[in-house]
């Protein structure tokens, strides 16, 4: 089945190579009175449009026309391989569904001892990657045709390293403790938290 609409406002910048704020208005079929749409656009839109943004849309359309098919074929292949690589995560989980926009990578923290906010903070601070949204027990990452192999590798590496840290923290409670000097602590898991005082009270 093909879903149709009379008018669609399409944000170009979300998934295509175009500047933020750029969008297109699509009109379909004969129900929409195109002259009325043009009339209201002239009444409501700015008399000083951003030519930088409009040029960005033009460049995007040119890219799609000349290179779009080949670029999207590469993107789909990269995305599929990336999603397959995430199948071995032990605590974080890639959310999959039958009817689903595969370009949106949703990572669930439902079975992990970390919150979605903590995962977002770790991704930002340790790996300098920007998730699209944090909510409930998941984190959303947007991908696009502009993403490189290196970009997918960075996100995959970040998720696996965080996933491994979660496993380590969990296992720290069941492993046998072993006293060690602080200088030998690198690469080991602390049995308890270490705090600096003052200020505050232990």
Predicted segments, located by residue:
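Conserved C-terminal alpha-helix-loop-beta "cap" of PLP-dependent enzymes
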Residues: 87-202
């Amino acid at each position: 089945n093909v879903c149709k609409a009379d008018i669609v406002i399409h944000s170009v910048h979300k998934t295509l190579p175009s500047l933020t704020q750029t969008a297109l208005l699509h009109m379909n079929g004969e129900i929409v009175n195109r002259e009325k749409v043009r009339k209201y656009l002239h009444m409501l839109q700015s008399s000083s449009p951003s030519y930088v943004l409009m040029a960005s849309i033009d460049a995007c359309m040119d890219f799609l026309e000349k290179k779009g098919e080949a670029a999207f074929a590469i993107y789909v292949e990269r995305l599929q391989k990336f999603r397959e690589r995430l199948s071995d995560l032990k605590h974080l989980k890639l959310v999959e569904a039958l009817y689903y926009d595969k370009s949106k990578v949703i990572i669930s923290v439902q079975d992990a001892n970390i919150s979605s906010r903590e995962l977002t903070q770790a991704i930002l601070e340790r790996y300098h990657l920007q998730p699209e949204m944090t909510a409930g027990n998941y984190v959303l990452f947007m991908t696009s045709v502009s993403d490189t192999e290196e970009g997918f590798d960075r996100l995959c590496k970040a998720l696996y390293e965080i996933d491994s840290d979660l496993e380590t923290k969990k296992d720290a409670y069941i492993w046998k403790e072993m006293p060690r000097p602080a200088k030998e602590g690198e690469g080991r898991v602390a049995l308890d938290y270490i705090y600096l005082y003052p200020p505050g009270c232990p």
